[in-house]
Amino acid sequence: MKIAIMGSGAVGAYVGARLQAAGADVTFVARGAHGQAMQKQGLQIIMPGLDLHLPQVHAIDHPSALEPVDLVVFAVKLTDAMAAAESLKPVLRPDTRVLTLQNGIDSVSMLSEALPQAQIRGGTIYVSAVIEAPGVIKSPGGFHRVVADAAKGDPVMQALAALGERCEALDVALADDVARIIWEKFIGLSAFSGCTTLLRARIGDILSHPESTAFLQQLVEESVAVAQAAGQTVPAQMVDNYMKNLRAAPPSFRSSMSEDLERGKALELPWLSGRVHQLGQSLGVPTPAHTAVYRALVLYAKGQA
């Protein structure tokens, strides 16, 4: 199976590395020092008990050099999504599928503005990883999973699932109700990203104080309320279960958005707390905590030069 990774940052590179190790022919679209390092020395995954070193990977710095592929795994930050989609458009074959693994609930509709909607498949991903150094991805471990739209038996998605059965340290599943799963991730991620970014804190510090813990839980509750008002069915114990999962997470756990703020990069804020705020306004659901996050961080949303 021929796969391109569009957006080979920490998450994209991790997924691509595991798929290549399972036998896929993978092309990584990666820019800058990270992409150059991959071209020269391959790609390394550092993970407790599950290290992986691929001495040779095919890395290109622009999709214009992309050969025909069966699947594009679209893992670009939402801040760069439209530009990346436009750059992909000229080389996209009619039989190629584009699997978006981006955050938020809007990626399929966003990409549909630039790419044929019939070729786009929704999905979501659960991976904890950072770029430790150019060409080196570090993960603390844990459960890493891709969930993709089954798309009524689409053979490309079936091939991805079959490939996933051979993957180590990456579970690949297909779902008929992927929209629900995307919403469930959005509920938790919007709260977690908003809280860790606004407070400039890791989850262990947040949960060590009752007031910051209450703020995090309020964010989750608001996300649930908005989802329900939007017509989504949310598990009855979702708030309690999500808070329980965060208490079991490594104390150093924090969101990529908090890291982006620290580095002066553009933030996915408009598609996370900003989206909860917008939905709350349109649906008549109060979202004071998410509104506070959005308004407090909006000046940093485009990054700092």
What is each of the regions a protein language model found here?
Residues M1, D70, T96, F143-H144:
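Nucleotide donor/acceptor-binding cores
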Residues M1-L54:
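NAD(P)+-binding Rossmann beta1-loop-alpha1 motif at the extreme N-terminus of oxidoreductases
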Residues F28, A59-I60, A148:
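Generic preference for hydrophobic
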Residues L52-V136:
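Rossmann-like NAD(P)(H) cofactor-binding subdomain of soluble oxidoreductases
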Residues L92, V136-V146, L199-I206, R254-R263:
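Helix-loop-beta segment of a Rossmann-like dinucleotide-binding subdomain
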Residues L101-K185, A191:
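Rossmann-fold dinucleotide-binding core
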Residues A179-L207, E211-V224:
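Active-site-proximal catalytic alpha-helix in oxidoreductases
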Residues Q217-A305:
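NAD(P)-dependent Rossmann-like dehydrogenase/reductase catalytic/cofactor-binding core
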